[in-house]
């Protein structure tokens, strides 16, 4: 079994100024290939601590992936740390230096002298070309172990991982098969209760993860071959699908917006948002069938979109009645076959309150959610609640009634 560790380098990561999306990407990539990730570490731009971290990782892992610290400045120290740990001296590689100078020449600029360190190599390192940046990576074999050093910008790291690193990695001795089921409308603890002892098994394993769009359930199995891993996971996967059938909206790379589009069955969708700042439109932007939208908190504009003055005066915008009227208004005033509305408040006494409603020819529904949080969280949760309501209603049409809970 190939064991891996990830070291993310950068004081800005350590201080929380930048989110470490690289480690999340690499973790998913390793899992998909049956490589076991044991640890993820964040280290600042300090040569001593980087060297110590590398020594520790090499003592317990077969593959160490270092992200960041390959820039041209004095605080980019990944190359120096690897060289120190392996007791090798970096030297300028003529081919890398010529490549770097060519990049700057193509831009009509001379190469700054500080960039020369990006042409360094040690004897045990192979340079990894960077097609979208100036920092080559390193692929190092030492004592039966592998060190991979990649630049920090995600666009560079991800492309180099796929094009340069994966072809060089040894194949794992076991194959992994995994499927992630996406659910909505049920909490993580409720899922755990329903699944019972299934979550205690090691192979196949069943794990739950809370996400913005609901709760994910991952079923994974490992075996000597891909076919054996799939066969091992199949009965457990079927059981989980059966238990959670009423809440599952998709699998693996599916999106909730995409699932809603499927339930539309070719019908057009119109959206009215009041208070959510276009969060719902952002989720739907690339979906076919998304016809039109109105995003506003202006009362006069909302009245032209279907909100009645009576409702505005009696219960206000953030109300079940307003959501229902605006969902119907999305059909009437935006010309859509299905109308979806979200009304929410991100501040004041009603902060965190949201009503979402759907109106279609043969289906209407409304739901109420109350999730306190910062304004961005409130907007995102309201938008997801609207999509969840649309999916449930359009998949299994139900009579309209009082507001439920999304």
Swiss-Prot record:
It comes from the Bacteria. CDD domains: cinA (cd00885). InterPro entries: CinA (IPR050101), CinA-like_C (IPR036653), CinA_C (IPR008136), CinA_KH (IPR041424), Competence-induced_CinA (IPR008135), MoaB/Mog-like_dom_sf (IPR036425), MoaB/Mog_dom (IPR001453). Pfam families: CinA, CinA_KH, MoCF_biosynth. Belongs to the CinA family. This is CinA-like protein.
């Amino acid at each position: 079994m190939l064991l891996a560790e990830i070291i993310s380098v950068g004081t800005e990561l350590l201080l929380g100024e930048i989110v470490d999306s690289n480690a999340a990407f690499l973790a998913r990539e390793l899992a998909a290939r049956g490589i076991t990730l044991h640890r993820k570490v964040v280290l600042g731009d300090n040569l001593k601590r980087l060297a110590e971290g590398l020594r520790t990782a090499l003592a317990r892992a077969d593959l160490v992936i270092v992200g960041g610290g390959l820039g041209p400045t004095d605080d980019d120290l990944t190359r120096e740390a690897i060289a120190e740990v392996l007791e090798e001296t970096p030297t300028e590689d003529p081919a890398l230096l010529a490549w770097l100078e060519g990049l700057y020449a193509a831009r009509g600029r001379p190469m700054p002298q500080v960039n020369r360190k990006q042409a360094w190599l040690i004897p045990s390192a192979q340079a990894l070309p960077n097609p979208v940046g100036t920092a080559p990576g390193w692929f190092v074999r030492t004592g039966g172990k592998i060190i991979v050093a990649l630049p920090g910008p995600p666009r560079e790291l991800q492309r180099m991982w796929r094009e340069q690193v994966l072809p060089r990695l040894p194949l794992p001795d076991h194959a992994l098969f995994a499927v992630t089921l996406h659910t909505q409308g049920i909490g993580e603890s409720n899922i755990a209760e329903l699944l019972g002892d299934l979550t205690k098994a090691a192979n196949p394993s069943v794990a739950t993860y809370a996400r913005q769009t609901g709760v994910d359930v991952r079923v994974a199995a490992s075996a000597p071959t891909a076919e054996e891993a799939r066969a091992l996971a199949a009965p457990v996967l079927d059981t989980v699908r059966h238990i959670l059938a009423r809440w599952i909206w998709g699998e693996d790379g599916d999106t909730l917006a995409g699932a809603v589009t499927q339930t539309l069955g070719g019908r057009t969708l119109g959206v009215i948002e009041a208070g959510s700042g276009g969060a719902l439109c952002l989720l739907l932007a690339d979906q076919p069938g998304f016809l039109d939208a109105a995003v506003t908190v202006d009362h006069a504009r909302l009245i032209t979109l279907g909100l009645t003055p009576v409702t505005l005066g009696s219960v206000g915008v953030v109300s079940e009645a307003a959501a229902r009227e605006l969902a119907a208004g999305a059909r009437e005033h935006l010309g859509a076959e299905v109308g979806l509305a979200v009304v929410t408040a991100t501040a004041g006494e009603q902060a965190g309150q949201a009503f979402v409603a759907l109106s279609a020819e043969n289906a209407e529904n409304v739901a109420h959610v109350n999730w306190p949080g910062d304004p961005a969280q409130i907007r995102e949760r309201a938008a997801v609640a609207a999509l969840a309501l649309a999916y449930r209603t359009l998949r299994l049409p139900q009579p309209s009634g009082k507001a439920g809970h999304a």
